[in-house]
Amino acid sequence: MAGGVGGRVVVGRHVYGNLYGCDARVLGDEAALITIVKEAVRVANAMLLSIGSYRFGPNGGLTVFAVVAESHISIHTWPEHGFATVDVYTCGDHTDPKAAFDFIVEKLSPKKIEVFYGDRSMYSE
């Protein structure tokens, strides 16, 4: 049930946001972003299953994503605009998606951020 009535059966927490005014060089650096996402997995206390990336054209943005046992972490970049979106979704009480999100924000050094939170849990009736 929405609103947390009853006991929580499945724990799911989603932290996501928009980062403005990031350094275009970092947003275009595939190796750096992969390293950041791998470290964010550790910070979240999640278990890395796979990591991947995709560059959109020779001078385009990047998508870097980690599939973790608990769900996923992703960064999508638009270097030409100094803009990135970050998505950290984890399941389980042992994970800390907010810490992973904050770590990524620290590494991308945006001038402005918007952050959003979603409860993706299931509650017993």
Curated annotation (Swiss-Prot):
Keywords for the protein's UniProt record, in alphabetical order: Autocatalytic cleavage, Decarboxylase, Lyase, Polyamine biosynthesis, Pyruvate, S-adenosyl-L-methionine, Schiff base, Spermidine biosynthesis, Zymogen
UniProt EC number: 4.1.1.50
Positions of the catalytic residues: S71, H76, C91
PTM sites of type Pyruvic acid (Ser): S71
Recorded GO MF terms: adenosylmethionine decarboxylase activity
InterPro entries assigned to the protein according to its UniProt record, in alphabetical order: AdoMetDC_C (IPR042286), AdoMetDC_fam_prok (IPR003826), AdoMetDC_N (IPR042284), S-AdoMet_deCO2ase_core (IPR016067), S-AdoMet_deCOase_pro-enz (IPR017716)
Biological process terms in GO annotation: spermidine biosynthetic process
Record site feature (Cleavage (non-hydrolytic)), residues: E70, S71
Cofactor-binding details, from the entry: Binds 1 pyruvoyl group covalently per subunit.
Listed HAMAP family: AdoMetDC_1 (MF_00464)
Family as reported in the entry's similarity comment: Belongs to the prokaryotic AdoMetDC family. Type 1 subfamily.
Protein name: S-adenosylmethionine decarboxylase proenzyme
Organism this protein belongs to: Pyrobaculum arsenaticum (strain DSM 13514 / JCM 11321 / PZ6)
